[in-house]
Amino acid sequence: MPDKQKGPGRTIGSSILLIKTFIGQQSTVELWDTILARFDAEDREEFSRLTPAGWGSYRLFDSLLRHGAAAVHADPAVFADAFGAFQVEHDTAFLYKMALKFGGPGLMVLETDQLWRRYHNTGHLKVYEMLRNSAKARVADLSGGSPLLCVVVGGFIRKGLELAGASNVAMSHERCVHRGDANCEYAANWD
């Protein structure tokens, strides 16, 4: 479990570095130099010392999502949602995928906070309503991030539920700290 800290939250370095892999799969053209050129000095410095097991700022995470989306000519929200789905597929080991498949969407829902803490050192993701084909979850105590982080989380949850056997997953982000709400809240419905 990540150490909690005061101040703006951070995300695990492997998550930020995975965005580079995702960008590479979006285009046959090498885009990395173009993206690095768009970084400001602070982003370049932080990225140069980032390690998979270290923590990176949400600022860098957001910057890489925005510059990556621009490089592949994608809407940032569409790009962020697709990255969230890519991340859960990439980071979920085969055996865990099988456990999710046999455990069904309910297991995915029960594991949400453990999954959250794997990637973030701030906030908690808790399910507060669970029905047979729907669930609602809340991210509380989030420090930092951006609206694109919220989109990544939605894509991650949606794809995680699909990997767990849910079909026709519909996600909504009903409340958002970046729109002035106290917490972020997500609702998922599936067949």
Report the location of each language-model feature.
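N-terminal leader/assembly segments
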Residues: 1-74
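Short, mixed-charge aromatic SLiMs
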Residues: 41-48, 88-91, 176-187
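Short alpha-helical "patches" and their helix-cap loops
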Residues: 30-42, 78-82, 110, 168-177
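Amphipathic interaction/junction segments at domain boundaries or subunit interfaces
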Residues: 50-152, 175
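Short, electropositive, low-hydrophobicity segments enriched in small/polar residues
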Residues: 58-60, 159, 184
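Short terminal or interdomain "cap/linker" segment that borders an active site or interface and mediates
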Residues: 2-20, 117-154, 161-191
